[in-house]
Amino acid sequence: MLELSEVLIGHVRELAGRIGTRYIGSTGNTAAGEYIRREMERIGLAVEIQESPCPAWSARRTILEAEEIQLRVYVDPFSPPVEVTASMVPACTIAELEHADLSGKIALLYGDLTSAPVSPKQWFLITEREQQIIALLERKRPAAVLSARPGVSYFGHGFCDADFSLPSATLPRDVALALLRKNPSAVHLRLETERRPGSTANVIGRIPGKRAETIVLCAHYDTATTTPGACDNAGGVAIILALAARFASRPAACTIEFAAFSGHEYLPLGVDAYWKTAKAEKIIAAVNFDGAGHILGTNTLTAMAASDKLIRAARSKLAAYPGAVWVEPWPESDHSAFAMRGVPALAFGGAGIREITHSPADTADGISPLKLNEAASLAAEILLELKDKKVEWGRE
Protein backbone atom coordinates (compact mmCIF):
# COMPACT_ATOMS: atom_id res chain seq x y z
CA MET A 1 0.00 0.00 0.00
CA LEU A 2 1.30 3.47 -0.89
CA GLU A 3 2.24 5.84 1.92
CA LEU A 4 -0.01 8.89 2.32
CA SER A 5 2.71 11.22 1.04
CA GLU A 6 3.07 9.15 -2.15
CA VAL A 7 -0.69 9.16 -2.72
CA LEU A 8 -0.87 12.92 -2.26
CA ILE A 9 2.01 13.76 -4.60
CA GLY A 10 0.65 11.28 -7.15
CA HIS A 11 -2.59 13.26 -7.40
CA VAL A 12 -0.64 16.51 -7.72
CA ARG A 13 1.51 15.13 -10.54
CA GLU A 14 -1.57 13.95 -12.41
CA LEU A 15 -3.48 17.22 -12.06
CA ALA A 16 -0.66 19.78 -12.34
CA GLY A 17 1.75 17.66 -14.38
CA ARG A 18 0.02 15.43 -16.90
CA ILE A 19 -3.16 17.51 -17.21
CA GLY A 20 -1.72 20.95 -16.42
CA THR A 21 -3.68 24.18 -16.77
CA ARG A 22 -7.32 23.65 -15.84
CA TYR A 23 -9.13 26.95 -16.39
CA ILE A 24 -12.90 26.77 -16.81
CA GLY A 25 -14.22 25.72 -20.20
CA SER A 26 -10.90 24.16 -21.25
CA THR A 27 -10.09 20.56 -22.13
CA GLY A 28 -7.76 20.47 -19.12
CA ASN A 29 -10.62 21.44 -16.83
CA THR A 30 -12.80 18.68 -18.25
CA ALA A 31 -9.97 16.12 -17.94
CA ALA A 32 -9.36 17.10 -14.31
CA GLY A 33 -13.04 16.77 -13.45
CA GLU A 34 -13.10 13.30 -15.02
CA TYR A 35 -9.98 12.26 -13.11
CA ILE A 36 -11.50 13.37 -9.80
CA ARG A 37 -14.77 11.59 -10.59
CA ARG A 38 -12.95 8.34 -11.40
CA GLU A 39 -10.90 8.54 -8.22
CA MET A 40 -13.97 9.14 -6.07
CA GLU A 41 -15.83 6.25 -7.69
CA ARG A 42 -12.79 3.98 -7.29
CA ILE A 43 -12.71 4.81 -3.59
CA GLY A 44 -16.39 3.89 -3.36
CA LEU A 45 -18.01 7.29 -2.89
CA ALA A 46 -21.46 8.15 -4.18
CA VAL A 47 -20.68 10.83 -6.79
CA GLU A 48 -22.79 13.77 -7.96
CA ILE A 49 -21.84 16.03 -10.88
CA GLN A 50 -23.06 19.65 -10.74
CA GLU A 51 -22.63 21.37 -14.12
CA SER A 52 -22.50 25.13 -14.66
CA PRO A 53 -22.38 27.14 -17.90
CA CYS A 54 -19.20 29.15 -18.38
CA PRO A 55 -17.25 30.84 -21.17
CA ALA A 56 -14.91 28.60 -23.16
CA TRP A 57 -12.04 30.83 -24.28
CA SER A 58 -8.79 30.31 -26.12
CA ALA A 59 -5.98 32.47 -27.49
CA ARG A 60 -4.00 31.63 -30.62
CA ARG A 61 -1.60 34.52 -31.17
CA THR A 62 -0.71 37.80 -29.47
CA ILE A 63 1.40 40.51 -31.15
CA LEU A 64 2.48 43.94 -29.92
CA GLU A 65 4.76 46.09 -32.08
CA ALA A 66 6.16 49.59 -31.67
CA GLU A 67 8.55 51.21 -34.15
CA GLU A 68 8.86 47.83 -35.94
CA ILE A 69 10.05 46.14 -32.74
CA GLN A 70 8.02 43.21 -31.42
CA LEU A 71 7.34 43.40 -27.69
CA ARG A 72 6.15 40.84 -25.15
CA VAL A 73 2.51 41.05 -24.15
CA TYR A 74 0.09 38.64 -22.45
CA VAL A 75 -3.52 38.57 -23.57
CA ASP A 76 -5.96 38.85 -20.67
CA PRO A 77 -8.21 35.82 -20.08
CA PHE A 78 -11.58 36.07 -21.87
CA SER A 79 -10.47 39.12 -23.92
CA PRO A 80 -12.29 39.58 -27.23
CA PRO A 81 -10.11 39.69 -30.37
CA VAL A 82 -8.71 42.86 -31.90
CA GLU A 83 -6.26 44.09 -34.50
CA VAL A 84 -5.50 47.80 -34.29
CA THR A 85 -2.76 50.33 -34.98
CA ALA A 86 -3.32 53.42 -32.87
CA SER A 87 -1.73 55.98 -30.61
CA MET A 88 -1.28 55.20 -26.93
CA VAL A 89 -2.82 57.18 -24.07
CA PRO A 90 -1.18 56.53 -20.68
CA ALA A 91 -3.16 56.93 -17.46
CA CYS A 92 -2.15 56.21 -13.87
CA THR A 93 -5.14 57.56 -11.89
CA ILE A 94 -8.91 57.62 -12.13
CA ALA A 95 -8.71 61.40 -12.59
CA GLU A 96 -6.47 60.95 -15.65
CA LEU A 97 -8.90 58.37 -17.02
CA GLU A 98 -11.78 60.80 -16.57
CA HIS A 99 -10.02 63.50 -18.60
CA ALA A 100 -8.49 61.26 -21.28
CA ASP A 101 -9.71 61.05 -24.88
CA LEU A 102 -9.52 57.29 -25.43
CA SER A 103 -11.90 56.70 -28.32
CA GLY A 104 -10.24 54.46 -30.90
CA LYS A 105 -6.90 54.64 -29.09
CA ILE A 106 -4.97 52.19 -26.92
CA ALA A 107 -5.20 52.93 -23.22
CA LEU A 108 -2.05 52.13 -21.23
CA LEU A 109 -2.89 51.80 -17.54
CA TYR A 110 -0.18 51.86 -14.89
CA GLY A 111 0.55 53.03 -11.35
CA ASP A 112 -2.47 53.27 -9.06
CA LEU A 113 -4.75 51.85 -11.76
CA THR A 114 -2.78 48.59 -11.92
CA SER A 115 -1.73 48.21 -8.29
CA ALA A 116 -3.96 45.11 -8.25
CA PRO A 117 -5.94 43.19 -10.89
CA VAL A 118 -9.43 44.58 -11.54
CA SER A 119 -12.10 42.18 -10.27
CA PRO A 120 -14.76 40.77 -12.62
CA LYS A 121 -18.01 42.72 -12.69
CA GLN A 122 -19.91 39.90 -11.03
CA TRP A 123 -17.34 39.23 -8.28
CA PHE A 124 -18.99 39.66 -4.89
CA LEU A 125 -15.93 41.44 -3.47
CA ILE A 126 -15.59 44.00 -6.30
CA THR A 127 -14.93 47.50 -4.97
CA GLU A 128 -16.52 50.81 -5.97
CA ARG A 129 -13.11 51.92 -7.28
CA GLU A 130 -12.89 48.88 -9.57
CA GLN A 131 -16.43 49.47 -10.81
CA GLN A 132 -15.50 53.08 -11.57
CA ILE A 133 -12.44 52.03 -13.60
CA ILE A 134 -14.50 49.55 -15.64
CA ALA A 135 -17.32 52.06 -16.24
CA LEU A 136 -14.92 54.79 -17.39
CA LEU A 137 -13.15 52.50 -19.83
CA GLU A 138 -16.34 51.08 -21.32
CA ARG A 139 -17.83 54.57 -21.67
CA LYS A 140 -14.72 56.04 -23.33
CA ARG A 141 -14.34 53.03 -25.69
CA PRO A 142 -10.61 52.68 -26.34
CA ALA A 143 -9.76 50.20 -29.10
CA ALA A 144 -7.88 48.15 -26.49
CA VAL A 145 -6.57 48.34 -22.94
CA LEU A 146 -3.00 47.51 -21.89
CA SER A 147 -2.17 47.11 -18.20
CA ALA A 148 1.36 47.37 -16.80
CA ARG A 149 2.09 44.45 -14.50
CA PRO A 150 2.97 46.00 -11.12
CA GLY A 151 5.54 43.47 -9.90
CA VAL A 152 8.62 41.75 -11.23
CA SER A 153 7.46 38.21 -10.42
CA TYR A 154 3.74 38.13 -9.65
CA PHE A 155 1.88 36.91 -12.72
CA GLY A 156 -1.31 38.95 -12.44
CA HIS A 157 -3.44 40.04 -15.40
CA GLY A 158 -5.01 43.48 -15.44
CA PHE A 159 -8.43 42.06 -16.29
CA CYS A 160 -9.98 38.60 -16.20
CA ASP A 161 -13.64 39.07 -17.02
CA ALA A 162 -15.85 37.59 -19.73
CA ASP A 163 -18.26 40.49 -19.14
CA PHE A 164 -15.63 43.17 -19.82
CA SER A 165 -16.36 44.34 -23.36
CA LEU A 166 -12.94 45.70 -24.36
CA PRO A 167 -9.94 43.81 -25.77
CA SER A 168 -7.23 43.79 -23.12
CA ALA A 169 -3.73 42.51 -22.43
CA THR A 170 -1.07 42.84 -19.75
CA LEU A 171 2.49 44.11 -20.21
CA PRO A 172 5.60 42.87 -18.42
CA ARG A 173 7.22 45.58 -16.35
CA ASP A 174 10.16 46.12 -18.72
CA VAL A 175 7.89 46.55 -21.76
CA ALA A 176 5.66 49.02 -19.92
CA LEU A 177 8.75 51.01 -18.90
CA ALA A 178 10.01 51.12 -22.50
CA LEU A 179 6.66 52.27 -23.89
CA LEU A 180 6.20 54.98 -21.26
CA ARG A 181 9.75 56.28 -21.79
CA LYS A 182 9.65 56.33 -25.61
CA ASN A 183 5.95 57.17 -26.07
CA PRO A 184 5.86 55.91 -29.70
CA SER A 185 3.48 57.68 -32.07
CA ALA A 186 1.58 54.44 -32.71
CA VAL A 187 1.59 50.81 -31.63
CA HIS A 188 0.17 47.77 -33.35
CA LEU A 189 -1.75 45.23 -31.25
CA ARG A 190 -3.19 41.94 -32.45
CA LEU A 191 -5.07 39.58 -30.14
CA GLU A 192 -6.33 36.41 -31.82
CA THR A 193 -8.86 34.93 -29.42
CA GLU A 194 -12.07 32.91 -29.52
CA ARG A 195 -14.87 32.76 -26.99
CA ARG A 196 -17.90 30.46 -27.06
CA PRO A 197 -20.34 28.91 -24.59
CA GLY A 198 -18.85 26.15 -22.45
CA SER A 199 -19.40 24.32 -19.21
CA THR A 200 -17.60 23.25 -16.07
CA ALA A 201 -18.63 20.98 -13.20
CA ASN A 202 -18.32 20.38 -9.49
CA VAL A 203 -17.54 16.80 -8.51
CA ILE A 204 -19.14 15.89 -5.18
CA GLY A 205 -18.42 12.59 -3.43
CA ARG A 206 -20.26 11.47 -0.31
CA ILE A 207 -19.83 8.94 2.47
CA PRO A 208 -23.37 8.59 3.85
CA GLY A 209 -23.75 8.68 7.62
CA LYS A 210 -26.51 7.69 9.99
CA ARG A 211 -27.52 11.33 10.46
CA ALA A 212 -28.48 13.98 7.92
CA GLU A 213 -25.90 16.41 9.29
CA THR A 214 -22.86 16.84 7.03
CA ILE A 215 -19.21 17.84 7.21
CA VAL A 216 -17.95 19.31 3.92
CA LEU A 217 -14.31 19.05 2.85
CA CYS A 218 -13.72 21.15 -0.26
CA ALA A 219 -11.06 22.35 -2.69
CA HIS A 220 -11.25 24.00 -6.10
CA TYR A 221 -9.59 22.19 -9.00
CA ASP A 222 -9.72 24.89 -11.68
CA THR A 223 -6.72 27.16 -12.31
CA ALA A 224 -5.95 30.54 -13.75
CA THR A 225 -5.08 30.50 -17.46
CA THR A 226 -1.38 31.07 -16.82
CA THR A 227 -0.42 28.22 -14.51
CA PRO A 228 -0.36 24.44 -14.04
CA GLY A 229 -1.72 25.16 -10.56
CA ALA A 230 0.13 22.70 -8.33
CA CYS A 231 -0.11 24.61 -5.07
CA ASP A 232 -3.19 26.47 -6.32
CA ASN A 233 -4.83 24.06 -6.09
CA ALA A 234 -3.90 20.51 -7.10
CA GLY A 235 -2.55 20.06 -3.58
CA GLY A 236 -5.92 20.89 -2.06
CA VAL A 237 -7.68 18.39 -4.32
CA ALA A 238 -5.06 15.76 -3.46
CA ILE A 239 -5.83 16.25 0.23
CA ILE A 240 -9.58 15.77 -0.11
CA LEU A 241 -9.08 12.67 -2.30
CA ALA A 242 -6.64 11.19 0.23
CA LEU A 243 -9.02 11.91 3.11
CA ALA A 244 -11.90 10.39 1.15
CA ALA A 245 -9.88 7.18 0.73
CA ARG A 246 -9.05 7.14 4.43
CA PHE A 247 -12.62 7.59 5.68
CA ALA A 248 -14.54 5.67 2.97
CA SER A 249 -14.23 2.37 4.84
CA ARG A 250 -15.22 3.80 8.22
CA PRO A 251 -18.47 5.78 7.88
CA ALA A 252 -19.10 8.35 10.60
CA ALA A 253 -22.33 9.15 12.40
CA CYS A 254 -22.72 12.16 10.09
CA THR A 255 -22.40 12.32 6.30
CA ILE A 256 -18.98 13.40 4.99
CA GLU A 257 -18.95 15.27 1.70
CA PHE A 258 -15.88 15.81 -0.50
CA ALA A 259 -16.50 18.72 -2.87
CA ALA A 260 -14.14 19.49 -5.75
CA PHE A 261 -15.33 22.88 -6.98
CA SER A 262 -14.66 24.42 -10.40
CA GLY A 263 -15.04 28.10 -11.22
CA HIS A 264 -13.19 29.60 -8.25
CA GLU A 265 -10.48 31.39 -10.25
CA TYR A 266 -12.91 33.39 -12.38
CA LEU A 267 -16.11 33.71 -10.39
CA PRO A 268 -17.48 31.50 -7.61
CA LEU A 269 -19.39 29.51 -10.24
CA GLY A 270 -18.79 26.19 -8.53
CA VAL A 271 -19.72 27.16 -5.01
CA ASP A 272 -22.76 29.09 -6.32
CA ALA A 273 -23.95 25.92 -8.09
CA TYR A 274 -23.39 23.96 -4.88
CA TRP A 275 -25.59 26.31 -2.88
CA LYS A 276 -28.54 25.86 -5.22
CA THR A 277 -29.28 22.59 -3.40
CA ALA A 278 -27.16 22.63 -0.23
CA LYS A 279 -28.85 23.32 3.10
CA ALA A 280 -26.78 25.42 5.50
CA GLU A 281 -28.75 24.26 8.53
CA LYS A 282 -27.57 20.67 7.94
CA ILE A 283 -23.83 21.42 7.73
CA ILE A 284 -21.76 20.95 10.88
CA ALA A 285 -18.71 22.66 9.36
CA ALA A 286 -16.83 23.17 6.11
CA VAL A 287 -13.08 22.62 5.77
CA ASN A 288 -11.51 24.23 2.69
CA PHE A 289 -8.05 23.59 1.22
CA ASP A 290 -6.50 26.25 -1.02
CA GLY A 291 -2.76 26.83 -1.32
CA ALA A 292 -1.28 24.35 1.16
CA GLY A 293 1.80 22.20 0.54
CA HIS A 294 4.44 24.29 -1.23
CA ILE A 295 8.08 23.60 -0.37
CA LEU A 296 8.71 27.34 0.10
CA GLY A 297 5.47 27.96 1.97
CA THR A 298 4.08 27.52 5.46
CA ASN A 299 0.79 25.69 5.91
CA THR A 300 -1.81 27.90 7.58
CA LEU A 301 -5.16 27.37 9.27
CA THR A 302 -7.91 29.81 10.19
CA ALA A 303 -11.63 29.90 10.93
CA MET A 304 -14.65 31.99 9.99
CA ALA A 305 -18.15 32.03 11.52
CA ALA A 306 -17.00 29.45 14.07
CA SER A 307 -17.75 29.11 17.77
CA ASP A 308 -15.04 29.52 20.39
CA LYS A 309 -15.36 25.79 21.07
CA LEU A 310 -14.61 24.88 17.46
CA ILE A 311 -11.71 27.32 17.26
CA ARG A 312 -10.20 26.00 20.49
CA ALA A 313 -10.53 22.43 19.22
CA ALA A 314 -8.85 23.27 15.90
CA ARG A 315 -6.05 25.23 17.54
CA SER A 316 -5.39 22.47 20.05
CA LYS A 317 -4.89 20.03 17.16
CA LEU A 318 -2.70 22.57 15.35
CA ALA A 319 -0.41 22.84 18.38
CA ALA A 320 1.00 19.39 17.60
CA TYR A 321 2.19 20.65 14.17
CA PRO A 322 4.94 23.25 14.76
CA GLY A 323 5.48 23.71 11.02
CA ALA A 324 1.98 25.16 10.54
CA VAL A 325 0.54 28.44 11.87
CA TRP A 326 -2.82 29.95 12.79
CA VAL A 327 -3.56 33.14 10.79
CA GLU A 328 -6.18 35.86 10.65
CA PRO A 329 -9.32 34.96 8.65
CA TRP A 330 -9.08 35.54 4.90
CA PRO A 331 -12.13 35.51 2.60
CA GLU A 332 -10.61 34.85 -0.84
CA SER A 333 -11.65 31.24 -1.27
CA ASP A 334 -14.69 29.01 -1.19
CA HIS A 335 -14.88 28.71 2.60
CA SER A 336 -16.21 32.28 2.72
CA ALA A 337 -19.38 31.19 0.88
CA PHE A 338 -20.10 28.84 3.79
CA ALA A 339 -19.23 31.41 6.45
CA MET A 340 -21.48 34.03 4.83
CA ARG A 341 -24.37 31.60 5.30
CA GLY A 342 -23.55 31.05 8.96
CA VAL A 343 -21.76 27.73 8.46
CA PRO A 344 -18.56 27.37 10.52
CA ALA A 345 -15.63 27.24 8.11
CA LEU A 346 -12.01 26.21 8.57
CA ALA A 347 -9.53 27.16 5.87
CA PHE A 348 -6.15 25.58 5.12
CA GLY A 349 -3.86 27.78 3.04
CA GLY A 350 -0.23 28.73 2.52
CA ALA A 351 1.92 31.69 3.56
CA GLY A 352 4.97 32.99 1.71
CA ILE A 353 3.94 31.91 -1.80
CA ARG A 354 2.25 35.03 -3.19
CA GLU A 355 4.64 35.44 -6.12
CA ILE A 356 4.18 31.81 -7.17
CA THR A 357 0.39 31.99 -7.23
CA HIS A 358 -1.14 32.01 -10.73
CA SER A 359 2.31 31.85 -12.33
CA PRO A 360 3.95 29.30 -14.65
CA ALA A 361 6.29 28.55 -11.72
CA ASP A 362 3.52 26.81 -9.72
CA THR A 363 4.60 23.35 -10.84
CA ALA A 364 4.35 19.91 -9.25
CA ASP A 365 8.06 19.82 -8.40
CA GLY A 366 7.48 22.74 -6.04
CA ILE A 367 5.13 20.71 -3.85
CA SER A 368 6.36 19.07 -0.65
CA PRO A 369 4.81 15.64 0.02
CA LEU A 370 5.63 16.17 3.71
CA LYS A 371 3.77 19.48 3.86
CA LEU A 372 0.76 17.97 2.08
CA ASN A 373 0.89 15.10 4.56
CA GLU A 374 1.04 17.63 7.40
CA ALA A 375 -2.13 19.41 6.22
CA ALA A 376 -3.97 16.15 5.50
CA SER A 377 -3.05 14.63 8.86
CA LEU A 378 -4.11 17.74 10.77
CA ALA A 379 -7.38 17.86 8.82
CA ALA A 380 -8.03 14.19 9.62
CA GLU A 381 -7.62 14.89 13.33
CA ILE A 382 -10.04 17.81 13.10
CA LEU A 383 -12.51 15.67 11.15
CA LEU A 384 -12.41 13.01 13.86
CA GLU A 385 -13.16 15.74 16.41
CA LEU A 386 -16.12 17.07 14.41
CA LYS A 387 -17.80 13.90 13.17
CA ASP A 388 -19.90 13.25 16.28
CA LYS A 389 -20.82 16.88 16.94
CA LYS A 390 -24.24 18.44 16.49
CA VAL A 391 -24.75 21.37 14.11
CA GLU A 392 -25.20 23.84 16.97
CA TRP A 393 -21.81 23.04 18.53
CA GLY A 394 -19.74 24.88 15.93
CA ARG A 395 -22.01 27.88 15.39
CA GLU A 396 -21.06 31.34 16.66
Language model region names:
Residues 65-100, 156-230, 242-249, 253-255:
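Soluble metallo-hydrolase cores and metallopeptidase-like ectodomains found primarily
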Residues 2-6, 10-118:
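Noncatalytic luminal/extracellular "stalk/propeptide" segments of secretory-pathway proteins
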Residues 1-2, 18-27, 90, 119-128, ...:
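Second-shell loop/turn segments in exported
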Residues 106-109, 144-147, 204, 215-218, ...:
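Structural recognition of the beta-strand scaffold that forms the well-ordered cores
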Residues 54-55, 113-115, 150-154, 211, ...:
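Solvent-exposed loop/turn segments at secondary-structure junctions
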Residues 144, 149, 295-396:
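Active-site-adjacent substrate-binding region
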Residues 165, 199-202, 223-313, 327, ...:
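Acidic/histidine-rich catalytic neighborhood of metal-dependent amide-processing enzymes
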Residues 7-10, 14, 31, 35-38, ...:
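Extracytoplasmic/secreted proteins, especially bacterial periplasmic and envelope-associated proteins
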